[in-house]
UniProtKB/Swiss-Prot annotation:
It catalyses: di-trans,octa-cis-undecaprenyl diphospho-N-acetyl-alpha-D-muramoyl-L-alanyl-D-glutamyl-meso-2,6-diaminopimeloyl-D-alanyl-D-alanine + UDP-N-acetyl-alpha-D-glucosamine = di-trans,octa-cis-undecaprenyl diphospho-[N-acetyl-alpha-D-glucosaminyl-(1->4)]-N-acetyl-alpha-D-muramoyl-L-alanyl-D-glutamyl-meso-2,6-diaminopimeloyl-D-alanyl-D-alanine + UDP + H(+). InterPro entries: GlcNAc_MurG, Glyco_trans_28_C, GlycoTrans_28_N. CDD domains: GT28_MurG (cd03785). It is a peripheral membrane protein. HAMAP family: MurG. It is found in: Cell inner membrane. One of its GO terms (biological process) is peptidoglycan biosynthetic process. Its EC number is 2.4.1.227. Cell wall formation. Catalyzes the transfer of a GlcNAc subunit on undecaprenyl-pyrophosphoryl-MurNAc-pentapeptide (lipid intermediate I) to form undecaprenyl-pyrophosphoryl-MurNAc-(pentapeptide)GlcNAc (lipid intermediate II). GO terms for molecular function: UDP-N-acetyl-D-glucosamine:N-acetylmuramoyl-L-alanyl-D-glutamyl-meso-2,6-diaminopimelyl-D-alanyl-D-alanine-diphosphoundecaprenol 4-beta-N-acetylglucosaminlytransferase activity; undecaprenyldiphospho-muramoylpentapeptide beta-N-acetylglucosaminyltransferase activity. UDP-N-acetyl-alpha-D-glucosamine binds at S15, G16, G17, N125, S190, Q290. It is an enzyme of class 2 (transferase). This is UDP-N-acetylglucosamine--N-acetylmuramyl-(pentapeptide) pyrophosphoryl-undecaprenol N-acetylglucosamine transferase.
């Protein structure tokens, strides 16, 4: 019998790959009448964090650097975060704590264990994060985006379904995208990607003669220069919309013929959900997580191609885009993504948690 859940605390922070799933879980739990509190770092000004969401900033730090001053500073931040998280959890009194990876969740997870609150985790990537691996020995269960990663954890692990961000098939954004062919969506990730913002526009303007009705929806990231990227498209006479962040990303993906993107877990999940072929350019850091994600997308999902950042050139990108926009290739990749999607779990994270309690 499923246990009644009244309150849930979410340990969040870091990049969009950790934050977006947490917000999705928050929305799903709120619809069930469950009170949700977000605890973490770096969300105060995050564009995804809407008004009315209960959030408390928790200091965090990872003392794994050689500089002794930084070690001391980060250790103090971690201790401060742990004490504040203990206080917030005592006041909120949740029935469980859910961690979404990244070291920003560390103080909250430690505080949750100290209060003996049941712990759950969510892993977005195909390579398990270190925090999730560490805490899996204490967790009641962990939900994952992709089933191959379940073997890496010491607790019950299962692929779960997370509701996607809101979208509308009749939205103005969707209509704008579908009025042009081809529509290409460029996503640099939640932190932006300078090399994508530089190389991709230069490559796409070279294709304007082949695709005169091409429309590009380019999300540069919150720290990037929108006007600089837009100038390249305008100079090349490419119809475009350049934005730092896109709240209606699913609308754009559903209307797109191709997406050019980093290979973070969240965008990979949304590309798969929208069944849109992709050219993935994985971020070379983050312990190689994105390259593993991209290889899975190419080799298992057969949904597109991968270009390593060190191999990225305008010429190569033009070749890959031309290949991807071929109607036969595009249809084949869409069908592959659709076939894989039909095999995926439909069990919600909420249902999985209730089974494990």
């Amino acid at each position: 019998m499923m246990k009644k859940i009244r309150k849930v605390a979410l340990a969040v922070g870091g990049s969009g790959g950790h934050i977006v799933p947490a917000l999705s879980v928050k929305e799903a739990f709120s619809r069930e009448g469950i009170d949700v509190l977000l605890l973490g770092k770096g969300l105060k000004n995050h564009p995804s964090l809407q008004q009315g969401i209960s959030y408390r900033e928790i200091p965090s730090g990872l003392p794994t650097v050689l500089n002794p001053i930084k070690i001391m500073s980060r250790t103090l931040s971690l201790c401060s975060g742990y004490l504040k998280a203990r206080k917030e959890l005592k006041i909120f009194d949740p029935d469980l704590v859910i961690g979404f990876g990244s070291y920003h969740s560390l103080p909250v997870l430690l505080a949750g264990l100290s209060h003996k609150i049941p712990l759950f985790l969510h892993e977005q990537n195909l390579v398990p994060g270190k925090v999730n691996q560490l805490f899996s020995r204490y967790a009641r269960g962990i939900g994952v985006n992709f089933s191959p990663v379940t073997k890496h954890f010491r607790c019950p692990a299962e692929e779960v379904f997370l509701p996607k961000r809101s979208f509308s098939l009749g939205s103005p954004m969707m209509k704008r995208c579908t009025n042009h062919t081809p529509t290409i969506c460029v996503v640099g990730g939640s932190q932006g990607a300078q090399i994508l913002n530089t190389c991709v526009p230069q490559a796409l303007v070279k294709l304007v003669n082949k695709y005169p009705n091409m429309y590009v929806h380019h999300i540069v990231g919150p720290k990037s220069d929108v006007m600089k990227v837009q100038h390249v498209y305008n100079r090349g006479e490419v119809l475009c919309c350049v934005k730092p962040f896109e709240e209606q990303l699913l609308d754009v993906l559903l209307a797109a013929d191709l997406v050019i993107s980093r290979a973070g877990a969240t965008i990979l999940e949304e590309i798969l959900w929208a069944k849109v072929p992709g050219i993935l350019i994985p971020y070379p850091g983050a312990y190689g997580h994105q390259e593993v994600n991209a290889k899975f997308f190419v080799d298992v999902l057969e949904g597109g191609t991968m270009i390593l950042e060190k191999e990225l050139t305008e010429k190569l990108l033009v070749e890959k885009v031309t290949f991807a926009l071929d109607s036969h290739n595009r249809e084949k990749q869409r069908n592959s993504l659709a076939a894989y999607s039909q095999q995926r779990s439909t069990k919600t994270f909420h249902a999985f948690i209730c089974e494990c309690l």
